[in-house]
Regions:
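Signal-transmission linkers at sensory-effector interfaces
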Residues: 1-25, 166-171
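Regulatory loop-to-helix N-cap segments in sensory/regulatory domains
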Residues: 2, 138-155, 163-171
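Short, hydrophobic-rich beta-strand element in sensory/regulatory alpha-beta domains
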Residues: 29-35, 41-50, 56, 83
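GAF sensory/regulatory domain recognition
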Residues: 45-71
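Regulatory sensory and allosteric helical modules in signal-transduction proteins
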Residues: 67-103
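Signal-transducing coupling segments at domain and membrane junctions
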Residues: 96-119, 139
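A short, aliphatic-rich beta-strand micro-motif
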Residues: 118-126
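Short hydrophobic/glycine-rich mini-motifs in sensory/regulatory modules
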Residues: 125-135
């Protein structure tokens, strides 16, 4: 008969997510787990949409080196046409080279460029079909997001979305 110790040899990699921790701490933990497989993901950030004011607001982030370009920022969604396009398509946006936005006039575009980010994968967040915000995976590298990598990042993205929804419904 198998010993009890033999039955409990695996430690759940994501067990910390069950703990009573603030969302920012959970996001930072999960970001480190993601970086074990995808070390090029330098920043994970969440911006929430306030339907009443039509504003997009920074909610939380995890940034390697803790030097986020956008920590407390809000802007009308109408001032971000490329983000509005994501909502219209109801699909993530992949930008393998952020230089396409190098002539952007918006503050958030300038801040991201100033920190040296080269690529971005942006997922729209939905709760029961209603748009609630965006999840950004940023990298200091160009072209790091291969299709097989995106499949795995999507899983993390949906996990983060559920964490955000859980946090919002608890408030």
């Amino acid at each position: 008969m198998q010993q009890d110790e033999d039955l409990f040899t695996h430690q759940d990699t994501l067990a910390n997510l069950h703990e009573n921790l603030p969302l920012t701490d959970k996001l930072e933990f999960l970001h480190q787990v993601i970086r074990e497989d995808f070390p090029f993901i330098d920043r994970v950030a969440i911006a929430l949409f306030d339907e009443k004011t039509e504003m997009l607001k920074t909610y939380t982030h995890s940034t390697e080196g803790n030097d986020s370009p956008i920590t407390t920022y809000e802007a009308p969604l109408s001032s971000a046409p490329s983000l509005r396009t994501i909502i219209e398509h109801r699909r993530p946006r992949l930008v393998q080279n952020l230089d396409i936005f190098s002539h952007g006039k918006h503050e958030h575009t300038k801040r991201v460029a100033a920190k040296g980010y080269k690529s971005s994968y942006t997922m729209p967040l939905y709760q029961s079909g209603t748009f609630i915000g965006f999840l950004f995976f940023n990298s200091l590298e160009e072209h790091p997001f291969a299709p097989q990598i995106l499949r795995q990042i999507d899983i993390y993205g949906h996990l983060i979305a559920l964490m955000v929804i859980n946090e919002l419904t608890a408030i």
